[in-house]
């Protein structure tokens, strides 16, 4: 039977010694958390001025880092995107190993292995004809899974806040942990796959020759050829396809459904792959059930900074505080 512990913050050094003498093995997890919380308060008592300095350092570092990142992205977008992608891929792995999140580690290894294979196929020259569709189908699949996972996680969190978890006799902390975990999985892999898809989209499109980041395309586009994958289009725009339909943009260029969805939604491209005319996503995806996918993609872009750069900035702040002797 776990002992009942009353934790009171106060009493100076005597109270701190009493907290150090508490046997944590006899306490429940909640009581252990209370003791650790009281120890932290006792340790940092009287450090208000020091804590104010640390807050100022944090604010200043965040402002300076944000300005530097914006300038870097504007002046050297390619290197910024590559470093951000590497940060997105590696930083969570450190916390996974440190905190023993083995389930996340298994999923991360599987995702990394398949994505590495797909990326390898996308960067080969000459490009195999089936590679573009393979790449876009894989990333579109991950995009839909991450989208659904994020929605389920968000609903679980909201149900917990409204107390609906009690109808199923589920503890609030268990329901909240489940919802937050699903939300994290959906958002993290949603951001990561979009960055990989954008990189592969640029490389494949420039290799095929119908697209170039700067300048004119190196090949002339036929009316019956998809500029994303370079394959023949057999289904008319007005016909209903068995596997996929054919889409026509406002510039009158036609594409395979999976290709243009991968290019615009997953690959984050807002222009025609051939003529670079602005793409009207609302017109192309007229079904109202498809529009949340576009808004979800914009949400993932906002979260990229939080996942990739926030841990680095926090680590930098901790390093500055350590050098200055702040605790």
Swiss-Prot record:
PROSITE patterns according to UniProt: ZF_RING_2
EC number: 2.3.2.27
Highest taxon, organism lineage: Eukaryota
UniProt-annotated location(s): Endoplasmic reticulum membrane
Zinc finger (RING-type): 226-276
Keywords attached to this entry: Acetylation, Endoplasmic reticulum, Membrane, Metal-binding, Transferase, Transmembrane, Transmembrane helix, Zinc, Zinc-finger
Transmembrane stretches, start-end: 50-70, 79-99, 100-120, 148-168, 172-192, 306-326
Keyword Ribosomal protein part of the UniProt annotation: no
A single cellular component GO annotation: endoplasmic reticulum membrane
One of the GO biological process terms: protein ubiquitination
Pathway of action: Protein modification; protein ubiquitination
Topology of this chain in the membrane: Multi-pass membrane protein
Chain's role: E3 ubiquitin ligase which accepts ubiquitin and transfers it to substrates thereby promoting their degradation by the endoplasmic reticulum-associated degradation (ERAD) pathway which is a pathway involved in ubiquitin-dependent degradation of misfolded endoplasmic reticulum proteins. May regulate the unfolded protein response to reduce endoplasmic reticulum stress.
Protein name: E3 ubiquitin ligase Rnf121
Organism: Mus musculus (Mouse)
Gene: Rnf121
């Amino acid at each position: 039977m776990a002992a009942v512990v009353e934790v009171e913050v106060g009493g100076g050094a005597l109270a701190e010694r009493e907290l150090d003498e508490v046997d944590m093995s006899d306490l429940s997890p909640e009581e252990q958390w209370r003791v650790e919380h009281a120890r932290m308060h006792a340790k940092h008592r009287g450090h208000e001025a020091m804590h104010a300095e640390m807050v100022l350092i944090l604010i200043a570092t965040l402002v300076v880092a944000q300005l530097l990142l914006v300038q870097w992205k504007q002046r050297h977008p390619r290197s910024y995107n590559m470093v951000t992608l590497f940060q997105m891929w590696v930083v969570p792995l450190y916390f996974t190993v440190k905190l023993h999140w083995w389930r996340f580690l298994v999923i991360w290894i599987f995702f990394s292995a398949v994505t590495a294979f797909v990326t390898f196929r996308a960067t080969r020259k000459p490009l195999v004809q089936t590679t573009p569709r393979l790449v876009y189908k894989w990333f579109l699949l991950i995009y839909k899974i991450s989208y659904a996972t994020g929605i389920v996680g968000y609903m679980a969190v909201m149900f917990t806040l409204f107390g609906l978890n009690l109808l199923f006799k589920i503890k609030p902390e268990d329901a909240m942990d489940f919802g937050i975990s699903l939300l994290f999985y959906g958002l993290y892999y949603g951001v990561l796959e979009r960055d990989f898809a954008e990189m592969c989209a640029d490389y494949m499109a420039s290799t095929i020759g119908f697209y170039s980041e700067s300048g004119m395309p190196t090949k002339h586009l036929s009316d019956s050829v998809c500029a994303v994958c370079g394959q023949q289009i057999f289904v008319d725009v007005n016909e209903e396809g068995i596997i996929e339909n054919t889409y026509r943009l406002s510039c009158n260029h036609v594409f395979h459904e999976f290709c243009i969805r991968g290019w615009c939604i997953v690959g984050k491209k807002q222009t025609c792959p051939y003529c670079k005319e602005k793409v009207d996503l609302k017109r192309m995806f007229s079904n109202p059930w498809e529009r949340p996918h576009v808004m979800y993609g914009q949400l993932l872009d906002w979260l990229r900074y939080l996942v990739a750069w926030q841990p680095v900035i926090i680590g930098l702040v901790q390093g500055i505080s350590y050098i200055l002797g702040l605790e």
